[in-house]
């Protein structure tokens, strides 16, 4: 029934074309209402595919109809200047607008946003022109573009009583500060594709302030650098101008360079650049314009414009929009403190994203030796990644240095530090997305290569996932396209040539301020090993562990109360360690279990102690957001138990799909309600290990206060 409803909604889109502006699928200010009505109502994956196929199939049909109508106008003598126009738009602009809208809807549908994602998007971007303002007449039973209001307002989508939202005219706009590196090296197809994506972000409520970075040009004369910047600015303006109004504006007088060094709080990065003319940014943003900022700054000493570092401009803009830019006097900081104490907002805009579009893509993975970091928890991973990149910029022990590797590592290092500096100025829910122009433009290289390759070259290509635009996907879901805890085999397309397979992997990195990760005992000091019997070991009652908060985490995550006394007694002699994310927002308890029929001494001597994930918990408010589950899981499989771990879950547990994607294997245990998972590479080929794993997963006693419910 639901699939049929979605298909009828899709048909309503096609049939409603004639009721909108010429050739457009979307009326003015309706983009977000449309998106939420159709694509964010928690459609299943199959329904999403049905919608995508429906949109794609109607494109060719509409083009044929328009061609027939145009032919009639040219051939029939009755269709003269005074004859009524056909209901089909005939201009190339109208067709382009319609096709562009259709592509936009498909890209949104491909984001696979869930109910939780939809609620998060609404909470951030809901108070927009696309939503009903207070005092306006409520829509009739026929919604936007013929979609019934009963479908658009399904109870499964909006929980609780719907309230009309009053939109304030002085509401701060949602902004993405975007850096385009080396645009002079992009061809027109890439640039236009990126421009299209940025206008789509605008349609979804996120305005871009674009900073050009042309530092790869090393001219002999300063004038040629200025010519290059001017040329690239004009190219970008033309590209954005192809995709509707309001058009982009150049802000060439807003960034200033100071020769003085004002005393600023330590939490604000030191920067010679600042926004000297704020209205040059705030006024056009209030009118919905995308802004383009050339890498130039006005010096208050020389009274001239000169070259400026693009990263410094990004930091200056972020500081300004966040309301953290102040003058030279200490009184400015006292005024800030007064505003904060009075609850006044001093932000000029809400910076939700910082986007870096770089030909090199995201940050390379330092753990796997190839591929790209999918997600970076800066609070926990920044130093290790920075050290790995810095090492590549230095000469080897033999005194040699690969210039190409060093140059790329330097760029990645600058982008990583830019992410760290900007996120330090922004709320914890802000993020930095680093991607390549091809991915930002949604140019599907892997599919194109698949079509061009020989049939026998892609035996496993069907296992690759749907290609999605990483920027649109992240805006709607606040997640990377792929989960960071997925094994590389789940992401990498299979190909006979390993280099070709790696070239098709995603190159987008999502960075967040994230959470600190604490592991007891610390595996960086001593690697976790099966404990010798009788040796003192960690206990959950030790002072380093906040037991009440740990119990609350477990109770909240599982939705039931733990029998604390029984649980402490059960794990007191088997505890391997504990992982804590943030302030007990997520965690894992891991043990060394003894197979049935063996004593601990024998199991230790024979190497048969089983590494077991006893509890994996995430606070409900943190589930599906911020990557808390991925952070905990990564800490477990990379740091705590890198050689493998097993665990069990009820066969009907909804989280089993998540477990399955991250495990090496799964086995439904006969004559029980348990499914067993493991990450140990050699488990399947080791019969004794598999029997021990199964024995432990069958016989672990549950420790819940309510024994009437099935064990978890």
From Swiss-Prot:
User: What does the UniProt entry say about where the protein is found?
Assistant: Mitochondrion
The top EC class is transferase
Describe the pH profile of activity.
Answer: Optimum pH is 8.8-9.
Q: Which PROSITE patterns does the record match to this protein?
A: GNAT_NAGS (PS51731)
- Keyword Amino-acid biosynthesis in record: yes
Q: Which EC number(s) are documented for this chain?
A: 2.3.1.1
Identify the residues that the record assigns to the N-acetyltransferase domain, covering every copy: 534-702
- Pathway(s): Amino-acid biosynthesis; L-arginine biosynthesis; N(2)-acetyl-L-ornithine from L-glutamate: step 1/4
Any one GO cellular component localisation term in the record = mitochondrial matrix
Q: What is this protein called?
A: Amino-acid acetyltransferase, mitochondrial
User: What organism is this sequence from?
Assistant: Neurospora crassa (strain ATCC 24698 / 74-OR23-1A / CBS 708.71 / DSM 1257 / FGSC 987)
């Amino acid at each position: 029934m639901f699939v049929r409803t979605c298909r009828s909604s899709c048909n309503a889109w096609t049939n409603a074309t004639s009721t909108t502006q010429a050739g457009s699928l979307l009326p003015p200010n309706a983009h977000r209402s449309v998106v939420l009505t159709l694509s964010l109502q928690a459609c299943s994956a199959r329904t999403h595919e049905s919608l995508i196929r429906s949109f794609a199939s109607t494109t060719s049909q509409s083009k044929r109809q328009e061609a027939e109508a145009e032919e009639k106008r040219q051939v029939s003598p009755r269709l003269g200047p005074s004859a009524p126009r056909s209901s089909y738009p005939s201009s190339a602009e109208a067709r382009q607008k319609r096709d562009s809208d259709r592509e936009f809807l498909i890209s949104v549908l491909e984001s696979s946003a869930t109910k939780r994602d939809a609620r998060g998007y609404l909470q951030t971007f809901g108070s927009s022109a696309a939503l009903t303002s207070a005092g306006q007449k409520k829509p009739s039973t026929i919604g936007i573009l013929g979609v019934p209001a009963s479908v658009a307002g399904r109870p499964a989508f909006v929980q609780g009583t719907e309230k009309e939202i009053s939109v304030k005219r002085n509401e701060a706009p949602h902004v993405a500060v975007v850096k385009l590196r080396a645009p002079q090296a992009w061809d027109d197809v890439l640039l236009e594709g990126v421009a299209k994506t940025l206008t789509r972000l605008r349609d979804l409520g996120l305005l871009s302030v674009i900073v050009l970075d042309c530092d790869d040009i090393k001219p002999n004369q300063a004038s040629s650098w200025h010519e290059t910047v001017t040329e690239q600015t004009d190219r970008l303006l033309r590209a954005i101008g192809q995709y509707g109004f309001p058009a982009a504006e150049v802000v060439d007088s807003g960034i200033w360079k100071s020769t003085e060094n004002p005393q600023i709080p330590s939490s604000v990065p030191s920067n010679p650049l600042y926004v000297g003319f704020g209205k040059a940014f705030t006024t056009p943003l209030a009118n919905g314009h995308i802004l383009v900022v050339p890498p130039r700054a006005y010096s208050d000493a020389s009274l001239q414009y000169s070259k400026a570092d693009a990263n410094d401009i990004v930091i200056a803009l972020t500081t300004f929009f966040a309301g953290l830019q102040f003058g030279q006097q200490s009184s400015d900081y006292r005024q800030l403190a007064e505003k904060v104490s009075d609850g006044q907002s001093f932000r000029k805009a809400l910076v939700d994203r910082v986007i870096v579009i770089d030909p090199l893509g995201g940050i390379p993975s330092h753990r796997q030796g190839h591929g790209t970091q999918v997600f970076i928890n800066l609070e926990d991973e920044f130093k290790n990644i920075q050290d790995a990149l810095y090492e590549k910029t230095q000469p080897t022990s033999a005194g040699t240095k690969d210039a190409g590797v060093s140059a790329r590592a330097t760029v990645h290092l600058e982008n990583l530090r830019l992410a760290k500096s900007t996120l330090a100025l922004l709320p914890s829910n802000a993020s930095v997305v680093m991607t390549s122009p091809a991915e930002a433009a949604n140019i599907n290289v892997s599919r194109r290569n698949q079509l061009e390759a020989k049939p026998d070259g892609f035996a496993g290509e069907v296992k690759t996932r749907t290609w999605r635009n990483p920027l649109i996907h992240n805006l709607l879901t606040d997640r990377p396209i792929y989960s960071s805890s997925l094994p590389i085999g789940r992401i990498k397309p299979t190909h006979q040539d390993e280099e070709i397979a790696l070239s098709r992997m995603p190159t987008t990195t999502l960075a967040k301020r994230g959470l600190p990760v604490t592991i007891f005992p610390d595996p960086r000091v001593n690697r976790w090993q099966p404990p010798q019997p009788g040796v003192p070991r960690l206990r959950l009652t030790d002072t380093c562990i906040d037991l009440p908060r740990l119990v609350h985490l477990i109770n909240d995550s599982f939705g039931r109360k733990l029998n604390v006394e029984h649980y402490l007694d059960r794990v007191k002699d088997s505890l391997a360690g504990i992982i804590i994310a943030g302030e007990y927002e997520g965690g894992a308890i891991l043990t060394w279990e003894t197979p049935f029929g063996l004593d601990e001494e024998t199991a230790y001597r024979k190497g048969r102690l089983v590494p077991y994930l006893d509890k994996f918990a995430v606070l409900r408010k943190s589930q599906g957001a911020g990557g808390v589950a991925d952070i905990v899981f990564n800490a477990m499989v990379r740091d705590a138990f890198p050689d493998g771990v097993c665990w069990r879950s009820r066969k009907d547990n909804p989280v089993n799909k998540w477990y399955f994607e991250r495990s090496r294997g799964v086995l439904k245990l006969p004559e029980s309600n348990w499914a067993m998972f493991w990450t140990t590479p050699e488990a399947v080929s080791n019969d004794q290990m598999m029997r021990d794993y199964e024995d432990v997963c069958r016989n672990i006693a549950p420790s819940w206060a309510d024994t009437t419910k099935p064990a978890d």
